Amino acid sequence: MKYDTSELCDIYQEDVNVVEPLFSNFGGRASFGGQIITVKCFEDNGLLYDLLEQNGRGRVLVVDGGGSVRRALVDAELARLAVQNEWEGLVIYGAVRQVDDLEELDIGIQAMAAIPVGAAGESIGESDVRVNFGGVTFFSGDHLYADNTGIILSEDPLDIE
């Protein structure tokens, strides 16, 4: 499904929170949306592998990487796993790498920057916790919509028909 965050903001301005414009699209899907699962991890993506092995249909993984752009939390291998398990998208408050490969994949990936250095894989972090970045607090179960214009968040799903 295609989402237009500008239109959604016009229709639902009282019901959505707008994430500060810190992110760029690195995935092959221009827009995406779904119910979110939150993760908090710093320069370590081991926990992401565990979560992205789950069925992701209708879901978006929101990763609070502390805003670090020293190590990439998502690479092509991890993004392919997300595509294989039908995740709608990834929002990374941190960095990604292998961007040429990422843009070929049918998944939305919003992140702050790209860097060639990979993350550690020790599974240090927490999932299903409240995370805050971009002026917005994210809770697992909230609904996120993203496109090349921005990212918005709603407690409840928006009627997009």
Curated annotation (Swiss-Prot):
Gene3D superfamilies according to UniProt: Ribonuclease E inhibitor RraA/RraA-like (3.50.30.40)
Molecular function GO labels: endoribonuclease inhibitor activity; enzyme binding
Coiled coil: none
Any one Gene Ontology BP term: negative regulation of RNA catabolic process
Keywords of this entry: Cytoplasm
Subcellular location, record wording: Cytoplasm
Domain of life according to the entry: Bacteria
Keyword Magnesium among record annotations: no
Principal cellular location given in the protein's record: cytoplasm
Quaternary context: Homotrimer. Binds to both RNA-binding sites in the C-terminal region of Rne and to RhlB.
Role of this protein: Globally modulates RNA abundance by binding to RNase E (Rne) and regulating its endonucleolytic activity. Can modulate Rne action in a substrate-dependent manner by altering the composition of the degradosome. Modulates RNA-binding and helicase activities of the degradosome.
NCBIfam families: NOT-MenG, PRK09372.1, RraA_entero
Similarity comment text for this entry: Belongs to the RraA family.
Listed name of the protein: Regulator of ribonuclease activity A
